[in-house]
């Protein structure tokens, strides 16, 4: 069963509605007991990195989430700030991330040459898979997704990058490390492209 982690941040209902349209059952988990037994996990998130990490830590679900993902190797998909939470740390805050995909979250304007770039990066952008992955099955060419963010994932090792987009520089907009996946864009706002990606995740 796919379970969506509801720790108070993220457009939970949008994901539930999309999976309903795909005729794929999901459960919204608000407690550790509700999250237990998940065979796939979606970790959404919006807002600031530290606020998201603090809310997750306070939710009572951090321990079971760590156990499911790290011990039982349950596939997890972090979305938007949920992807950023997979990193070790962020320019945006002081709290440590989950550290499941080694890397740091950087602000576009902190990159030399991008000090004056408009933030946030908002709207549709091309997404180019850089390696073959089941997450992007059927999305290998001409895929476009909706973005809304001012920070991006800088992988410690380029092998963790699944797909890239360009906004002043080429950046990793999708990452993976074994059973851990993350996407910076919003599949729930990306129409057929997003539905395809969420269906693909259900089949990983």
UniProtKB/Swiss-Prot annotation:
Active site: 80, 186, 188
The keyword Ribonucleoprotein belongs to this UniProt entry's keyword annotation: no
UniProt GO BP: L-histidine biosynthetic process
Keywords: Amino-acid biosynthesis, Cytoplasm, Glutamine amidotransferase, Histidine biosynthesis, Hydrolase, Lyase
GO molecular function: glutaminase activity; imidazoleglycerol-phosphate synthase activity; lyase activity
Entries under HAMAP family matching the protein: HisH (MF_00278)
Places the protein is found: Cytoplasm
Xref: NCBIfam families: IMP_synth_hisH
Protein name: Imidazole glycerol phosphate synthase subunit HisH
Keyword Repressor attributed: no
Organism: Bdellovibrio bacteriovorus (strain ATCC 15356 / DSM 50701 / NCIMB 9529 / HD100)
Pathway per the UniProt entry: Amino-acid biosynthesis; L-histidine biosynthesis; L-histidine from 5-phospho-alpha-D-ribose 1-diphosphate: step 5/9
Domain of life of the organism encoding this protein: Bacteria
Known catalytic reactions: 5-[(5-phospho-1-deoxy-D-ribulos-1-ylimino)methylamino]-1-(5-phospho-beta-D-ribosyl)imidazole-4-carboxamide + L-glutamine = D-erythro-1-(imidazol-4-yl)glycerol 3-phosphate + 5-amino-1-(5-phospho-beta-D-ribosyl)imidazole-4-carboxamide + L-glutamate + H(+); L-glutamine + H2O = L-glutamate + NH4(+)
